[in-house]
Structure formats: C-alpha cells, structure tokens
Amino acid sequence: PEFFIQRDMEYFDKAFRQAADGKEEVPLSLIGGALKKMMPKFKVRRYGCKTLGKLYERLDRYELVMTEKGVASAVRLKG
C-alpha cells in the first residue's frame, strides 16, 4: 500500500486543491468526488485503509477535522 500512496500522492494533493476552492477545511465527500473524476477506478482499500479519512490521515501534510461526535468530516493542511 505504501508504494501506491507514494505513486498517487499528486492525485491526493490535486483532489484536495480542487475540492478546497480556496477554503481551509475540505469535506471528505468533495475530495472523494474529485478523486473519482481523476481516477475512476479509485478504491481506498488499495491503499490499506478502510476510509478516505484514514488515508488522508496517513499523508503527512494533512490532518482530519473531527465532528463533536468524533467522526472525521473534513481535511485540512497541517500547520
């Protein structure tokens, strides 16, 4: 899975930028939609993760934004 993450990192960054549209926090649903447009066969499990949130959590430059119930709802750049 680590190989695939490194190989496709540019897509994860591009999907974040496209979905962000200038916003700091980006809903995971928008990122997922952008990834599906770029990579129609995108499957989060290929990267060893059960959810898109877990995948972005593994990427060093991003952090998850949690809801009050402790559910990951969005992603933002660290720092």
What are these regions (language model features)?
Residues 1-79:
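N-terminal regulatory modules in eukaryotic regulatory proteins
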